C-alpha cells in the first residue's frame, strides 16, 4: 500500500478575508481558518485585548465560534499548518459526540449549558433551535455586534438556510 506523504506547509491567513468568507457562508460550515483558542494557539495579549473590548474572551453562546469571530477584531493575520499540533476528540455526550450521531439538534430551552440570555438575544433571522449551524451563526452574529463590527449586516442567512435544509435534521 502506498501512502502519499503530504509536504509540510505553513500558510499565512488574512483574517479579514477569512472572516468575510465565513460571513458569506452564514457561519454555517464551522470555523474555517479563523483564529481560535479551540484547537489553536493565541497570544495571551490578544485574548486580553478581546476581553477588554467585550468584557469576555467568548462574546457569544458558542465559545469556539464567538472567540474566533471576536479575535478577528484583534488579529490581522493567522498561521495554519497541515501538521497536527493538537489532537482533539469529544465524548459521547458532548456536542461533537451528538453531531457524530446526527443528534446535534434540540430546542434551545433543552440546552442547559447555553447562557441564560441566549433565547432573549436570538436573531429572528436564525431558526430558533439549537444545532451546529444555528448556534454558530448566532454566536458569530453576537460576537460581531459585541466587537462593534459593521459586518454583522453582511451575514448571508440564505446560505445558512440552504445548509440547514440540506444537512440538518428538521425541528
Which residue stretches match the model-derived regions?
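Short, surface-exposed, polar/charged, turn-prone segments marking secondary-structure boundaries
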Residues: 7-13, 68-69, 107-109, 116
